[in-house]
């Protein structure tokens, strides 16, 4: 992973998760995201539309982008199959978020963590401003 891509992952707490509805239509929603070098994680209640979509079809796309336009648009795109984490894993990822921002938002108490492995960089598609990963 490039340092620029790592910086985008480290500096952005909100991204977009794209899933597929039962009728095949796309569903995109903003989520709170935290990452490490292996994966991106987000938190959602299991009753939300995107969480229900993941149970049915785990293939997702996650996008994070830099809002600092003075350096031009920069983004990270990760495609693959999401995993629903169990209670123990969710607790560990909540600790990762809490360490990053200094607290755990109260609405996260009922949230489940989801994981998408970052995987390999797609060098053919990636540019100097956008990095594409697939797992």
Where are these regions (language model features)?
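Short beta-strand segments
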Residues: 12-46, 62-65
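A short local loop/turn or secondary-structure capping micro-motif enriched for an aromatic residue
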Residues: 36-37, 49-52, 132-133
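A generic structural signal for nonpolar/aromatic side chains embedded in well-ordered alpha-helices
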Residues: 9, 54, 96-97
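Extreme N-terminal tail/first-helix region
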Residues: 1-15
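Helix-adjacent hinge/juxtasegments
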Residues: 50-76, 83
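Charged, amphipathic alpha-helical segments
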Residues: 1-3, 48, 99
